[in-house]
Amino acid sequence: MYDGYVALIDQDRIRILADGFTFTNEIRLDAKEEFLYVVETTGKRISRLRVRPDGKLTDREIFGPDNLGKGFPDGVTFDAFGNLWGTLIMSDQLFALTPEGECRILFDDGVPAATDALEKAFYARAVTPELMLAAAGKVAPWMASVTFGDPDLKTVYLGRLRGERIPYFRSPDAGLPMVHW
């Protein structure tokens, strides 16, 4: 199902800039604001579009693997070196895509048997709440977002949809400051 889109709000109207995505989720601009990265959660991939000076999006392509593997990409953020960090919810993995598009798993908190069962059900269109609930790690169950914080932007915070705390760790690399800072 391709029902996702990217829209821009201009003063009094909304314009759809790109559509045909599979469950559009989070979006991020790179440091130079040359490319917009779009998380396609149930498409299991990240798409990238060139941002033209007039705001139009062109040259759509898949960035990184065309299938990120088990789980579903959710939250993303950039580090200062141009690596796109992201989460795979339901497999509870933290990954990074290098500027060249190579995928590296940085942290794996998943439950392999539960994730395998959920993957099989996803492709059979037979996902149940019980399968989803079983696919939850211990440190960051249903890991859904990632961001860099603290003054040096070297503390990584992992957002999760289950649990009562926010896991974090120190990174040797800083995050990319947000454009609006």
Regions inferred by a protein language model and the residue ranges of each:
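Short loop/turn segments immediately following beta-strands, especially the blade-tip
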Residues: L49-K56, P99-R104, D109-V111, F169-H180
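Short loop/turn segments immediately following the C-termini of beta-strands
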Residues: T41, V51, I89, P99, ...
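Beta-propeller blade signature
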Residues: Y2-Q11, S171-A174
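Predominantly a core beta-strand signature of beta-propeller blades
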Residues: D3, R13-I16, D59-I62, E102-R104
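Blade-level signature of beta-propeller repeat domains, shared across WD40, Kelch, NHL, RCC1
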Residues: A140-W181
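A detector of repeated loop/turn-to-beta-strand junctions in beta-rich toroidal repeat architectures
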Residues: M1-D3, G43, L57, S91, ...
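Beta-rich, blade/repeat-based domains predominating
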Residues: M1-V6, R15-F35, P65-G86, S91, ...
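A short loop-to-beta-strand structural motif that recurs across blades of beta-propeller domains
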Residues: G4-A7, R45-S47, Q93-F95, R165-P167
